[in-house]
């Protein structure tokens, strides 16, 4: 009873029961967060149902304009002997509530409340002693900062970064002049939209969706094919987080940095090579800043990989992403002391 009374004070109250998820073989539960500047917020913890007792677990954290739908990823991790959880952050996917502005954020540290609640639940309630974080794109920025700011108080054993969002994919002139100007303007007009939805499905979405040139189906209300209005407040929040990370974080845990082997700036006309590169971010930025995360960073570029490497169209790139992931997990696990 005392624990139940303390949970709301600690933040991240978790609903009492698992509920059936839309993905077959998965379940979900709600994490109640403290209200923010726009009102009530929640996060959602998703779990792959599995038999037997497991002490190792992976927590997946998605990127921007995204949510967890990669069923094959969770299934494979469970088949490899790990428990699998995914976190839909506040105002994303399963956690988006009526009236909320999707993906709204004013500081990357806002998400630390649900990360802390999820990790605490996986360890203390579910009984996992060995936890790894697998994070994609903006999730890679968020989780890297979280591990630094909390000094990894949760005892995470390893961090896997899948095409992390460590810098904006702008031209040098935009980086030097436009981005600081926009970031500074956020204090005066934070709700100003600086990038609106596109008239045509964006090229990255076309590389993913079966309806276009990809291999996957997902909820396009949660992962928007035409994008979503980007406000100055969100841009400044991301930029402030990136500037902190780019100074170095001194993380003291094994880190795997995974990227495609090249980036392409897509044009308006479809080209087959778009299915064989990162269309969203510049992979050179990931490497430039990834090595500054800590002293134990290993990396792998994947030939013909896409921005989300675990959604790659090229079969060899897709298979290699899994092979690299499991090699890293098993190496980390083998070096973990047993109690």
How does the language model describe each region?
Residues 66-74, 78-100:
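Conserved alpha/beta-hydrolase
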Residues 296-339:
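Catalytic active-site module of serine/aspartate enzymes centered on a nucleophile-bearing elbow/loop
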Residues 14-52:
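N-terminal cap/lid segment of alpha/beta-hydrolase-fold proteins
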Residues 64-65, 93-132, 316-318:
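Catalytic nucleophile-loop/oxyanion-hole region of alpha/beta-hydrolase
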Residues 55-63:
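Short beta-strand element of the alpha/beta-hydrolase
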Residues 64, 88-93, 165, 303-306:
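Short beta-to-alpha linker loops that shape the active-site pocket of alpha/beta-hydrolase fold enzymes
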Residues 195-301:
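Serine-hydrolase catalytic core
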Residues 138, 143-232:
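Alpha/beta-hydrolase-fold enzymes
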């Amino acid at each position: 009873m005392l624990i139940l009374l303390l949970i709301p004070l600690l933040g991240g109250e978790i609903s009492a029961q698992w509920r059936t998820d839309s993905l077959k073989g998965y379940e979900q539960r709600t994490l109640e967060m403290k209200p923010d500047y726009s009102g009530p917020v929640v996060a959602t913890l998703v779990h792959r149902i599995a038999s037997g007792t497991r002490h190792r677990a992976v927590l997946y954290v998605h990127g921007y304009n995204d949510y967890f739908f990669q069923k094959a990823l969770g299934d494979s991790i469970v088949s490899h002997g790990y428990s699998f959880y995914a976190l839909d952050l506040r105002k994303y996917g399963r956690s988006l509530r009526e009236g909320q502005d999707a993906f709204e954020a004013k500081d990357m540290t806002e998400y630390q409340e649900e990360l802390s609640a999820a990790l605490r639940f996986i360890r203390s309630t579910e009984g996992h002693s060995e936890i790894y974080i697998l994070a994609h794109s903006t999730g890679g920025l968020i989780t890297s900062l979280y591990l630094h700011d909390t000094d990894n108080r949760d005892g995470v054993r390893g961090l896997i970064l899948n095409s992390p969002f460590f810098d904006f994919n702008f031209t040098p002139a935009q980086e030097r002049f436009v981005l600081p100007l926009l970031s500074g303007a956020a204090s005066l007009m934070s709700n100003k939209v600086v990038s609106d939805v596109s008239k045509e499905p964006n090229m990255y979405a076309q590389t993913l969706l079966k309806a276009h040139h990809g291999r996957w189906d997902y909820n396009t209300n949660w992962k928007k094919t035409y994008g979503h209005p980007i406000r100055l407040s969100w841009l400044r929040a991301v930029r402030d987080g990136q500037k902190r990370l780019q100074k170095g974080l001194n993380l003291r845990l094994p880190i795997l940095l995974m990227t495609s082997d090249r980036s392409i700036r897509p044009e308006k006309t479809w080209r087959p090579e778009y299915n064989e590169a990162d269309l969203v971010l510049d992979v050179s930025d990931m490497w430039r800043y990834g090595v500054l995360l800590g002293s134990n960073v290993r990396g792998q570029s994947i030939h013909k990989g896409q921005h989300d490497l675990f959604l790659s169209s090229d079969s060899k790139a897709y298979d290699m992403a899994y092979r690299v992931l499991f090699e890293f997990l098993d190496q980390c696990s083998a070096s973990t002391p047993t109690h």
